[in-house]
Amino acid sequence: MELYTAPPPGSTVICADELGPVIPRTFPPAPGWSGDGHRIKEPLEYSRGPEKTWVYGGLRVADGQAVTLCAPSRNSAFYQEFLQLEEQANPEGTIWVITGNLSSHDSKSTRAWLEDHPRIRHAFIPMRACWLNMQEGWWRIFRRQALAGHEFADPDEIAHATQVATAQLNARARPWIWGRPQPKPRSYRRRFIYTLKERSIKQ
């Protein structure tokens, strides 16, 4: 994972992934409070339906800033639109995109698009190794911020929640560092060792 630990000089490393599909609720809105006084929260549905929404996300490892895009489908066209946003957000240098080897990421259409955008290069993660993608960690934070405990009536509400959560997370973003951080040095208290010496008492 040299792109994480020692990226090429002047380059930008982006971890990219898609979250979803997410669909709005398929039931009438429930009352805000239950009979015993507890707040009612319906879990967000992850399923396939006519109004499903995919969330494209890209994490800039160097400073923790993220770019997101909501789309009604996961295909080459929307992936290229997402890459265009990344290119606009990173106007200088080579952009390394670390992502999974999905068909839309390496389709004929996407490869042709990349020929016209030579600054963007792919580094594909091996199959069954999604844990190598630091975007997965950002998704966990995003789900708690934007989706957990919320109901959405339509895709527009999902897009709005995504936009707000992304802005809030970017406001407090920090660099993402690959691997475990080194433990802090321990501070030891001074140890005072008292040695008792026996004295021979002359009688």
Language-model features: locations:
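Short beta-strand segments
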Residues: 14-16, 95-99, 123-126, 177-180
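Mobile genetic element proteins and their domesticated derivatives, centered on retroelements
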Residues: 15-17, 58, 64, 83, ...
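Short, solvent-exposed loop/turn segments at secondary-structure junctions
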Residues: 18-22, 61-63, 102-104, 128-130, ...
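Extended, low-complexity cationic-aromatic segments
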Residues: 1-81, 189, 193-196
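C-terminal domain-tail junction helix/linker
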Residues: 160-203
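Short, basic/hydrophobic alpha-helical segments
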Residues: 76-95
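RNase H-like polynucleotidyl transferase catalytic core
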Residues: 38-47, 114-134, 150-152
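RNase H-like two-metal-ion nuclease catalytic core shared by retroviral integrases
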Residues: 100-101, 123-145, 154-158
